[in-house]
C-alpha cells in the first residue's frame, strides 16, 4: 500500500503544481496506462515522448511495481486522481 500512496502523491504533486495550470493530456494517458494497462500498453504510451533507455527502463520498473497492487487499489488511485484534479483546490497553490 505504501507504493500506491507514494505513486499517487508524486503524480498529484506534478499535476497540481502551480507550474502546470493545464495538465498535458498525454501525461494523464501515461498515468492511466501505468495503472490500468499491460506493460506493453504502458511502454507504447511512453513512445510519443521519446524517453531514453534509462528513463524507459525506470518507467518499466515502476510499472512492474504498480502491477503488484490489487486491481481495486489501482482503480481507486485513478478515482482519487480524478477527484483531486477536478477539485477547486487543485487550482490553488497548495503547500504541504
Curated annotation (Swiss-Prot):
Organs and tissues of expression: Club cells (nonciliated cells of the surface epithelium of the pulmonary airways).
Induction profile: By glucocorticoids.
GO CC aspect terms: cytoplasm; extracellular space; nuclear envelope; secretory granule
Pfam families to which the protein is assigned, alphabetical: Uteroglobin (PF01099)
One Gene Ontology MF term: phospholipase A2 inhibitor activity
Chain segments annotated as coiled-coil in the UniProt record: none
Reported function: Binds phosphatidylcholine, phosphatidylinositol, polychlorinated biphenyls (PCB) and weakly progesterone, potent inhibitor of phospholipase A2.
Name of the molecule in the record: Uteroglobin
Species for this entry: Mus musculus (Mouse)
Amino acid at each position: 500500500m505504501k507504493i500506491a500512496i507514494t505513486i499517487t502523491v508524486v503524480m498529484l504533486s506534478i499535476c497540481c503544481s502551480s507550474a502546470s495550470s493545464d495538465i498535458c493530456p498525454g501525461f494523464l494517458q501515461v498515468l492511466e496506462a501505468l495503472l490500468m494497462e499491460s506493460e506493453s500498453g504502458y511502454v507504447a504510451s511512453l513512445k510519443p515522448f521519446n524517453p531514453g533507455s534509462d528513463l524507459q527502463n525506470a518507467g518499466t520498473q515502476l510499472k512492474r511495481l504498480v502491477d503488484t497492487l490489487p486491481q481495486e487499489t489501482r482503480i481507486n488511485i485513478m478515482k482519487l486522481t480524478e477527484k483531486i484534479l477536478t477539485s477547486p483546490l487543485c487550482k490553488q497553490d497548495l503547500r504541504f
